[in-house]
Amino acid sequence: MLNNNIVKRKNLSVIVLAFMVFVLAIVGFGCGTRTTVQLNNIPGTILNDGLAITNNTQWAWTNVQLTVNGSYNYSMEEINPQQTVNIVAKDFTHNGQSLDPSLLGAGTMLTGRCALPNNREGVFFIVWH
């Protein structure tokens, strides 16, 4: 009987510990640095921030999930994770021709230029999927 109570307590301890780890993982993930961006006034959230150094300049390569008429896998240069950026696409091109990204089929990649803070321009690409 005593051994049975010890086993039950150990099992309860393991369950409580697992639950605490689960809660901490959710809280930690939710509190991570996230940037709100807008592409042509469509809100999105930056995920999986990455950084590469090119020619002594920092370029932030970031994936954004946009959920308008489907979802975009969106990457762009020079986004500060601490700020909110309104990205206004100046043009979309595909095989050298401008087009509307809402008309794309799956797997189509767009590239384009966009306005960034401080009167800078950025380059982005979007893969529709």
Annotate each language-model stretch with its function.
Residues 29-33:
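N-terminal Sec signal peptide cleavage junction
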Residues 70-102:
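Intrinsically disordered, low-complexity Pro/Gly/Ser/Thr-rich segments with frequent PxxP/GP/PP motifs
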Residues 60-67:
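Short, hydrophobic/aromatic beta-strand segments
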Residues 51-58:
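Asparagine-centered strand-capping/turn motif at beta-strand->loop junctions
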Residues 4-18:
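Bacterial N-terminal signal peptides that target proteins for export
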Residues 92-129:
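Terminal connector regions
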Residues 17-27:
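Bacterial N-terminal signal peptides
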Residues 45-50, 103:
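Short, solvent-exposed loop/turn segments enriched in Ser/Thr/Gly
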